[in-house]
C-alpha cells in the first residue's frame, strides 16, 4: 500500500527551520532516520521510505506554500494514491508549540497552503497533521512570526516534537488514521 505524505513549507534557505516550514522539518527528519535523500522532481522534492511493508512517498512541494495543491494533485495522480491515503503536515498558529492534532478532514483554518490543496483537489476530506507553533506575536505580525526561526527554548524541545510527528506519520500508514488520531490527539 502507498501513502502520500506531504510536508508543507517554503523553498529557499531563508525559510529553513522557520515555523512555517515545520512540515518540511518532519519529512527531513524522517528521511534522515530512514537513510534516504530527497530528489528534485516535478513540483517537489521526493523521497520514498518503507515502513512495515508500506511505501511512504514523502513530498516537499517546490511551489511555495500558497500553491501546494499543484504538487499534491500531481503526485497523487502520478502515484495513483487515493485521497484517504494522503496526509498533509502543516504548522498551526491556533495550537500551542509542541501540540499535535490529527484530523481526517476539516477546514483550512485560514492556512493558505491547505486552502490551495482543498481548492485544487475540490475536497477537504484528506487527513492533516497540524503542528502547533504557538501564537506569541503582536497583532498584525503573524507573517513575520511564521517566517521566523523557532526560539531557543522551542529548539530544545524540537527533537521530541519531531519524534512525535514521525510517530504520527508512521502510525497513519501502519495502524490506520483512527488509531493514529487517538495516539496523537491525547498526547502533548
Curated annotation (Swiss-Prot):
Catalytically driven reaction(s): an N-acyl-L-alpha-aminoacyl-tRNA + H2O = an N-acyl-L-amino acid + a tRNA + H(+)
* Residues marked Stabilizes the basic form of H active site to accept a proton (site): 91
Quaternary structure?
Answer: Monomer.
* Family label: Belongs to the PTH family.
What this protein is called in its record is Peptidyl-tRNA hydrolase
Q: Which UniProt keywords apply?
A: Cytoplasm, Hydrolase, RNA-binding, tRNA-binding
GO cellular component, alphabetical, reads: cytoplasm
> Active site located where?
20
Say what the protein does.
Hydrolyzes ribosome-free peptidyl-tRNAs (with 1 or more amino acids incorporated), which drop off the ribosome during protein synthesis, or as a result of ribosome stalling.
Q: Where is this site: Discriminates between blocked and unblocked aminoacyl-tRNA?
A: 10
Q: Which GO terms describe its molecular function?
A: peptidyl-tRNA hydrolase activity; tRNA binding
Cell compartment(s), UniProt: Cytoplasm
Per the UniProt entry, what are the Gene Ontology biological process annotations, in alphabetical order? protein quality control for misfolded or incompletely synthesized proteins; rescue of stalled ribosome
Q: Name one Pfam family in it.
A: Pept_tRNA_hydro
What species does this protein belong to?
Cytophaga hutchinsonii (strain ATCC 33406 / DSM 1761 / CIP 103989 / NBRC 15051 / NCIMB 9469 / D465)
Tell me the enzyme class.
hydrolase
Q: Return the EC number.
A: 3.1.1.29
Kindly give the CDD domains that the UniProt entry links to this protein. PTH
Please tell me where tRNA binds in this chain.
15, 64, 66, 112
Q: Which NCBIfam families match?
A: pth (TIGR00447)
Source taxon at top rank: Bacteria
